[in-house]
Each structure stands twice: as C-alpha cells, then as structure tokens.
Amino acid sequence: MSHEGEEDLLEYSDNEQDIQVDASKAAEPSELDATTAEDASNGDAEKKGSYVGIHSTGFKDFLLKPELARAIIDCGFEHPSEVQQHTIPQSIHGTDVLCQAKSGLGKTAVFVLSTLQQLDPVPGEVSVVVICNARELAYQIRNEYLRFSKYMPDVKTAVFYGGTPINKDAELLKNKETAPHIVVATPGRLKALVRDKLIDLSHVKNFVIDECDKVLEELDMRRDVQDIFRATPRDKQVMMFSATLSEEIRPICRRFLQNPLEIFVDDEAKLTLHGLQQYYTKLQENEKNRKLAQLLDDLEFNQVIIFVKSTKRANELTKLLNESNFPAITVHGHMKQAERIARYKAFKEFEKRICVSTDVFGRGIDIERINLAINYDLTTEADQYLHRVGRAGRFGTKGLAISFVSSPEDEEVLGKIQERFDVKIAEFPEEGIDPSTYLNN
C-alpha cells in the first residue's frame, strides 16, 4: 500500500485461495426471543438474552477461558448463532476472517469473544484495535467488551472518536494505569493519534473492522485505515464484518487479509430478516406527516425509529411530533458529541419511545426494544435500506418496517431493493395489519 498524505481529522458518521463456507444451506434459525447488550457501564450487564441459535453446540464447546465462559452464562447465552458457530472455532486461533451476515445475528460477539480469548494483557500495550464508522457504534462495541470481560479485571478497554478533546485521549494513553489493551475507535481519531505519535500500535495482535464495507468504500476513510494498518505489526490477525459485502468491495477487503476464512451467512441475494414484516405506502410528499401520525396512533410498538434524509428534516419532524403529543428524540451527526451520546443512551434506556434519525443510526446500533422502523424518507441505496430496517426485529425477534414512497425515484429504489434482496415488499393495507404478525408474544 502506498503511503498517503496526512489528512486532518474527519467526521464520517453522518453521510447525507480462500476457505469459503456457504452457510446459506444450513437449517433456518428458530425464532427465539432475544435481547441485546445493555450498557455495561450503567450496571445493566446482568440482562439476560439469547442469540438466534440453531446448533446443539453450546458456547462451552468452544473451550473458552473460564472467565469468558462465566460472563457468557451471566448474559444468558447458551447456544451460538449460525455465524458464531461457523466463525469462532477458527477465529479464536488467529485465522483471518471476512464475514458477511445479516443484521442481528451476533457478529459483534464473534470478534469480542475471539479477541478476549487470545488476549494476554501487558500493562501499557495495545493488543486489539477495532475500527468502525460511527461513534455510537464504537461506544456500543466498547460496552460489549466491558460485559464479556467482567471477570477479567486486568483488561482495559477505551473508545476514541472525533468530537472530543484529543488531549484527554493522550492523557489516558500515556498513563500505564489507564492505558487500554483494547482500543475501539473511528478511523479519523485513531489516525490522528497515530500521526501525532500519541498511541503505540506496535504490539497489536488483532485488527478488526466492523461495518467494513462502509469503512472501506469511502476513499478518505480507507486512507486513514491504511495509515493505521501500517502502524501495526505485519504478523497479526485481521477480521472484517458487515451485514452487506458487495462483489465490488470484497477485493478491497481482501487486500488486508491473509488466507482468510470467508463466511457468507445467507447469499447476498437473499438478505432477508427473519420475523421482520416489510411494507411500503404510496403517498404525496405533503401527506407524509398525516400518515406518520396515523401510523403512530394505530400501530402497537415498543419503540420506533424514523429515518429521514437530512439533519434539517430530523429537527423539523421531531419538533412537529412533540407539538402533536408524540414525545420524540432526535439523533444526527451535527449535534455536539456529548448531546448525541446522551440522547442515544436516553433512547436505549427507554426514556423516549420515538427516535427520529439520519443514517447515523442506520448501521449496527442495537436497541432491543425497537420493533418498528419507518422510512419517512426512503434511502437512495438498497444496501442502506437493509441496515435501516435491520434496527427492528433484531436477533430473530419480530418487527415491522414501513417505507414511504412519494416520488418516481422512490419507486425505482423500491424496485431495486426487491430485486437486490429477492424479497416482495407489499403495500401497507388501508385496514392495517394484525399486531401478532410483528409483535412478540
């Protein structure tokens, strides 16, 4: 890889012969109720949950460290999901991994458990680097490390992202008492820390990119990742994960990998979400607000996420909803970092049931109570549609997704989505639908 010029710290998160395993032939997952990780730092690590498991194999059969096995039991996990079953046995032994599996099947746990299994913490040395595209996702991954390392008191994890003072990161890194063994970061901030020689990555043994297609498809972000990658040893494990991996992005991913295990759980053409009901409704642009209010009145839901195309529309729609007695919160990339994280936590902790968001919440964010996703503004990309609606119906639980179609461009995108994922999206019936089709018992 050629050495790229140094760039200023950028914000990315709000964008307005290989071993191959074909897991698509495996048995269909059973639909088990599930909950995702709660914020470990808030003392919610004892919440119980279960990934959609289809194998009689238990996590105990992976022969993990006793400390890890105990944390897994505390979380209520017994059987691995399909992607975990196919990946963990080799990833814990240092094999490079390229993994595509639909939203909600526990990809995060694959690299969290695999890296913790291999970790032998040395004070002051960074052993694991995890890169992701969004600050909220970095925060969430950090919390997964916290809950699975709860019985590994010597292990320290830190998260670094833009929008916070870099001198605070520097202070944490230079103090051996606080220096992390595991770093979760967005590319821009980590590149800046490397550039300014504030972090030493010469001891890294595991290099992970989550949502790798999003991280590597943008040239500026890819350059930052390359600079970070060059600061790590040549001999290390590299793992990449995403819900979508197009044929075009796979060769770019493979440049970072050596003889990888390639896992594709469900063929790309069939990236459907078990238990998720998908509909569209045709309307004029000026009818969207009335229709949204009607849906929020008529539908039964725990929490709903409403996707819009811009920060301005997010703010305006949230204001309108609150004025109409629909208490709502908004999250987008243009608000101050502390406010954004606070709102994310408030929504996750069920302080509000309605969240209006740009695509900053469109990838990887796990909030287990969301069972309704509404595309107020339909995305322009088929892959992004999957990431958006994947916020509902996580881990095989039921959910409902409704997309507003208000223009010929929207109709064209809807057609591409159905063709891309080999799925039929029906028009939402005027009389509504039976709540039992999208609500768990």
From Swiss-Prot:
PROSITE patterns, per database record: HELICASE_ATP_BIND_1 (PS51192), HELICASE_CTER (PS51194), Q_MOTIF (PS51195)
Superkingdom field: Eukaryota
Motif (DECD box): 210-213
Signal peptide positions (record): none
GO BP of this protein: mRNA processing; mRNA transport; RNA splicing
Motif Q motif per record, residues: 57-85
Single annotated GO MF: ATP hydrolysis activity
CDD domains: DEADc_DDX39, SF2_C_DEAD
Compartment list: Nucleus
Domain Helicase ATP-binding: 88-263
Region (Disordered): 1-46
The Helicase C-terminal domain, residue ranges: 291-436
Ligand binding (ATP): 101-108
Gene3D superfamilies linked to this entry: P-loop containing nucleotide triphosphate hydrolases (3.40.50.300)
Catalytic activity, reaction form: ATP + H2O = ADP + phosphate + H(+)
EC number(s) stated in the UniProt entry for this protein: 3.6.4.13
Family according to the record: Belongs to the DEAD box helicase family. DECD subfamily.
Domain notes: The Q motif is unique to and characteristic of the DEAD box family of RNA helicases and controls ATP binding and hydrolysis.
Role this protein plays: ATP-binding RNA helicase involved in transcription elongation and required for the export of mRNA out of the nucleus. SUB2 also plays a role in pre-mRNA splicing and spliceosome assembly. May be involved in rDNA and telomeric silencing, and maintenance of genome integrity.
This protein's name: ATP-dependent RNA helicase SUB2-1
Lineage: Eukaryota, Fungi, Dikarya, Ascomycota, Saccharomycotina
